[in-house]
Curated annotation (Swiss-Prot):
Protein name stated in the entry: Phage-like element PBSX protein XkdC
Isomerase found in the keyword field: no
SUPFAM superfamilies assigned to the protein according to its UniProt record, in alphabetical order: P-loop containing nucleoside triphosphate hydrolases (SSF52540)
Family: To B.subtilis YqaM.
Keywords: ATP-binding, Nucleotide-binding
Pfam families named among the record's database cross-references: IstB_IS21 (PF01695)
Entry's Gene Ontology BP terms: DNA replication
General function of this protein: May function as a transcriptional antiterminator.
GO function term, MF aspect, one: ATP hydrolysis activity
InterPro entries per the UniProt record, alphabetical: AAA+_ATPase, IstB_ATP-bd, P-loop_NTPase
Top-level taxon: Bacteria
TM segment ranges: none
Name of the gene: xkdC
Amino acid sequence: MTKRTIEQILDELRRGRRPLLADKPAESDASRYDCLRCKDQGGYLVRQNGLEVWTMCSCMAERKVKRLLGASEITHAFRQLGFKEFRTEGKPQAIKDAFECTKEYVADYEQIKDCRKNSIALLGQPGSGKTHLLTAAANELMRTCYVPVIYFPFVEGFTDLKNDFALLEAKLNRMKQADVLFIDDLFKPVNGKPRATDWQLEQMYSVLNYRYLNHKPILLSSELTIEGLVRVDEALGTRIYEMCSDYLVIIKGAAYELNHRLEGVR
């Protein structure tokens, strides 16, 4: 590359121009660029000690978070859920324990992510906020630690896979390889009986055993206790327990006290 060409590029950067935009009709910067600071170039030149230094723009982190959130398969509404939106005032101790455990897990994540006990499970009473808390954890990991998370709602996820087997291999591979896998409502019971066909068990074992062997974290919610998970499948249940035992809360008690959907019923 010639010296003249380098000077031309630097001149374009100083003026916030991009050659591909040179022939376009004049537009306001606000309509042309997502980021007015760097003109969507990811950085800009600043003068330091008489030299022009390329500085990364803060919008790069924002774009990364946006990509992570989009790839997570967490719905737009659930991406808004955080710890600040979770109410513990007046709640039973089990709910407060789940809240504190989940926040502690996020705080500890970087130190434990490669360990055997690097996962979290919130189990028990439906409607107690398990999904909210683990979604808040997933959102926090993506937004502050830039950790890729994949969300898999057990019932809906397997319904989609059953309806399109062409997706199966690619989806299971994503679930195995994700930095963090969030499994929501594992084996959700129907009329008190865990929902777990032989085919579902085979797929879940394949995913969870891979993650177990490779020390890959999971976020797990289920209405079943550890004993219930073990009864469904001992090999699977014991692996989940070993992975999650340091960050495990089982929420038990009266439904009217624990299920937020029943507030005000009596």
